[in-house]
Swiss-Prot record:
PROSITE patterns: MBD (PS50982). Residues 80-97, 107-130, 151-162, 178-254 have a biased composition (Basic and acidic residues). The modification Phosphoserine is found at residue 116. It comes from Arabidopsis thaliana (Mouse-ear cress). Keywords: DNA-binding, Nucleus, Phosphoprotein, Transcription, Transcription regulation. The methyl-CpG-binding domain (MBD) functions both in binding to methylated DNA and in protein interactions. GO terms for molecular function: methyl-CpG binding. One of its GO terms (cellular component) is nucleus. This is Methyl-CpG-binding domain-containing protein 11. Residues 4-74 form the MBD domain.
Length: 254
């Protein structure tokens, strides 16, 4: 009654020269099923890490994607998809083209062309008016021709007035130029006056210096004259003293 339960294994399809064994676990174990791959060398591999290490150390074996760890005979869908992607090279996909705008922006050249066309229309309109004057002016000319030479003078005067109104008056421009010249001359005169004033002030300063020198010289002369007079006075006093001494000596001897 207490004998060990026999371990039953089921062989499933596996890669070439490999075996895939399915072992139902004992009752009470964590995993319900267990798959083991048996290598051509007889080594049993029970997890993916062992399989990776074995394939690295033993080159020439099938790819790791061919090993199915499920209990079914066919590999998993992800493995099959990965094999297909590896087998068939992916064609170069062109990037999706961006949708073009419905309204293309107007380029600068087109805008310039429209402007030039608009300017040409205006110029042509002006030329037409010059070639074909308004009806009122044409009627006046016809009337003057019918009335005679007196009326032609009036028409000519009217034309001159129109031309005078159309042509800009050049007088203000000339007046502005003359006013600018006058301002420039005034500024030159002011500068010359300032230089003359500076010269005058310089000459005045020189004169004041000369006057000061003269006053100093005069004071020096006065001092010299006073010193001379003092010397003369001292000499006179000494002569008087000498005379008094001589008279005193003469009286003493007599």
């Amino acid at each position: 009654m207490g004998g060990e339960e026999e371990v039953v294994s089921v062989e499933l399809p596996a890669p070439s020269s490999w075996k895939k064994l399915f072992y139902p676990n004992k009752v009470g174990s964590v995993k319900k099923t267990e798959v083991v791959f048996v290598a051509p060398t007889g080594e049993e591999i029970s997890n993916r890490k062992q399989l990776e290490q074995y394939l690295k150390s033993h080159p020439g074996n099938p790819a790791i994607a061919e090993f199915d760890w499920t209990t079914s005979g066919t590999p998993r869908r992800s493995a099959r998809i990965s094999e297909k992607t590896k087998a068939t090279p992916s064609p170069d996909k062109e990037p999706p083209k961006k949708r073009g705008r419905t309204k293309s922006p107007v380029s600068k050249k087109d805008a310039e062309g429209e402007k030039s066309e608009g300017g040409g229309e205006e110029n042509s309109h002006v030329k037409d008016t010059e070639m074909n004057p308004p009806e009122g002016i044409a009627e006046n000319e016809n009337v003057t021709d019918k009335n005679g030479s007196g009326e032609t003078e009036r028409v000519n005067d009217a034309k001159e007035n129109i031309v005078a109104e159309e042509t800009p008056n050049a007088a203000p421009v000339q007046e502005e130029g003359e006013s600018m010249k006058e301002k420039a001359l005034d500024s030159v005169d002011d500068k010359s006056k300032e230089t003359d004033k500076e010269k005058d002030t310089g000459s005045i300063e020189k004169n004041s210096v000369d006057v000061e020198k003269k006053t100093v010289e005069a004071s020096d002369e006065k001092k010299n004259s006073e010193a001379e007079t003092r010397n003369h006075e001292e000499n006179g006093l000494t002569t008087e003293a000498e005379g008094k001494e001589k008279t005193a000596e003469g009286e003493a001897t007599g």
